[in-house]
Amino acid sequence: MELSVYISNERIEIVAGTGSKSKAKIKKVYSLAVPEGTIMNGIITGEQRLQETLEQIWNRYSLPKKGICLVIDSGKIMTKMLEVPYMKDKELISCINKEFADGEKTDLVTDYFPFPKNSPYEMNHIFCAAVEKSVIESYLSLFADLKLKVKRISIGLGCLLRAVTATGMFAYETCVFMLVQGSTTISVLFENGNYIYSRRNRMLSDQGSAEWIEELGQIADGIRQFYRQRHSSYTIDSIYLAGIAGGSDDVVKEFDTHMQEYGIRAKAPGMIKGISFVKTAVSDHGEINAEPASYIYGIGNLLL
């Protein structure tokens, strides 16, 4: 069993389970608070307090100290889509490194995810990401001090795309997936099931409030207008909303009403094909409703 661990500004999400290329069996999920100010935009800013919190969590829930797979998400992570011919791994890595070459940021760690091809004659479409080495080292140092063994580190958006691609979650759909992570919302646009674009927004209003719904609507409308400029033969007809504290049903209904004027339906993603998931997650205040798509970073990190 592996532990997929993601720490946001407000919470630590732990997904415990096993996975293969397109299937995963999730045995336990945790969604627990971390002290305010310990993580800011994916950067560790309160190491001592965060270390104490993680130590308490591992001891309280008797979590494994090996097989830890970290997920990092931050606005500081640079991402690109590349279209390249077939290359050996070494050549591809060199190509990716050149794409992110920057005089001010020379010490970068890169990662990539190749999308499946429909034909061997197609060009390769590669999702690439890069982050400063110091960010990776800060996480490794934190977990090493706790004697927790990190097996691998992945990028949040890469995990999301891996999960969507491996499970056919939005196959043949032109839609937006909005993942709420506390006060941040990550929006990902898919055209006919293929990744097009993503953005992240800092939310100013309280989650679930009328003002918050209005903010979501503004984000969605911005993406809709961006997509119209592509003059595609497809149209956005659905928005899938996940990551709502305690469950998404009521919020999705309100958001759906708000989006009707644009001819777009808001929906909850529901179950994910090939993913065996638990019904509840462990929180600081007992068991809470758990929806698979809300933990898509953790799920995608197990699909290898």
PLM-predicted stretches and their roles:
Residues 236-264:
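Glycine-rich phosphate-binding loops at beta-strand->alpha-helix junctions
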Residues 2-28, 70, 121-223:
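Small-residue (GG/TT-enriched) beta-loop-alpha framework at ligand/catalytic clefts
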Residues 255-294:
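Conserved phosphate-binding/catalytic loops in two-lobed NTP-binding clefts
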Residues 62, 179-194, 289-304:
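Extended, charge-rich low-complexity interaction segments
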Residues 215-232, 251:
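Phosphate/ATP-binding catalytic cores across multiple sugar-kinase/actin-like superfamilies
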Residues 1-99, 136-140, 235:
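Non-catalytic, solvent-exposed interaction/assembly segments
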Residues 67, 71-166, 268-282:
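Active-site neighborhood for divalent-cation/phosphate handling
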Residues 34-38, 205, 272-280:
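Surface-exposed loop and turn segments in beta-propeller and other repeat-based domains
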